[in-house]
């Protein structure tokens, strides 16, 4: 399985929302706060200095993860990780996590 990790593009906003809402509905529930953040990733994550990555397979976004800044400019929280249900267990989440670790090291983040 050839999975590629790519950075956020505005046209991926709906995929970010759908992947995360599916995960939340499966394991928890979607709170109003989640709804707001997930529906506006550019405003609530990217514009605040965060990063969003996607796992793509056959030109489809099949997983996502975000790095959100904390009060420190060099410390980020890994959040909003989700993978399509039918592709879980195939190490896609692990690839997203590894990408975040390498990205953070390359940018001297904690």
Where are these regions (language model features)?
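Acetyl-CoA-dependent GNAT
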Residues: 7-79, 84-86, 94-99, 103, ...
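Flexible nucleotide-binding loop
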Residues: 90
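Short acidic/polar active-site loop segments enriched in Thr and Asp
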Residues: 110
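Extreme N-terminal starter segment of soluble prokaryotic enzymes
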Residues: 2-4
